[in-house]
From Swiss-Prot:
Signal peptide residues on this chain, from the entry's feature table: 1-21
InterPro entries assigned to the protein according to its UniProt record, in alphabetical order: Competence_ComEA_HhH, Endo/Exo/Phosphatase_dom_1, RuvA_2-like
Naturally occurring in which organism (per UniProt): Haemophilus influenzae (strain ATCC 51907 / DSM 11121 / KW20 / Rd)
Protein name: Uncharacterized protein HI_1008
Statement: the UniProt record of this protein carries the keyword Repressor: no
Keywords associated with the record: Repeat, Signal
Pfam family, one: HHH_3
PANTHER family: ENDONUCLEASE/EXONUCLEASE/PHOSPHATASE FAMILY DOMAIN-CONTAINING PROTEIN 1, ENDONUCLEASE_EXONUCLEASE_PHOSPHATASE FAMILY DOMAIN-CONTAINING PROTEIN 1
Listed GO CC annotations: type II protein secretion system complex
BP terms from Gene Ontology: protein secretion by the type II secretion system
Residues in HhH domain copies: 49-79, 80-109
Coiled-coil ranges per UniProt: none
Length: 112
């Protein structure tokens, strides 16, 4: 009888501990999925030495691109807000104040 009681207690302890472990693993997995999704939704404007022209602020554009001051950087942001994201580098030529020389200086620094 004593052995039966001990066996029942041990089995109960195993069942309870395994359900706690399963809940903890499920909670950790859900938390990591939420964190990963949140990180994926925010595309960084500057990736190493590249600037995402579609997500960068005027300040980031000014700091990262050669020959772009505050006014041109703001013009890029305003153009993007009015016309949508840039699909290629040549579209920057449509922004007032951005010419071919400025585009060529920065072409390798821009990503979309």
């Amino acid at each position: 009888m004593k052995t039966l009681f001990t066996s029942v207690v041990l089995c109960g302890a195993l069942v309870v501990s395994s359900s706690f472990a399963e809940e903890k693993a499920t909670x950790q997995t859900a938390q990591s999925v939420v964190t990963t999704q949140a990180e994926a939704q925010v595309a960084p404007a500057v990736v190493s030495d590249k600037l995402n022209i579609n997500t960068a602020t005027a300040s980031e554009i000014q700091k990262s691109l050669t020959g772009i001051g505050a006014k041109k950087a703001e013009a890029i942001v305003q153009y993007r807000e009015k016309h949508g994201n840039f699909x290629n580098a040549e579209q920057l030529l449509e922004v007032q104040g951005i010419g071919k020389a400025t585009l060529e200086k920065n072409r390798d620094r821009i990503i979309f």
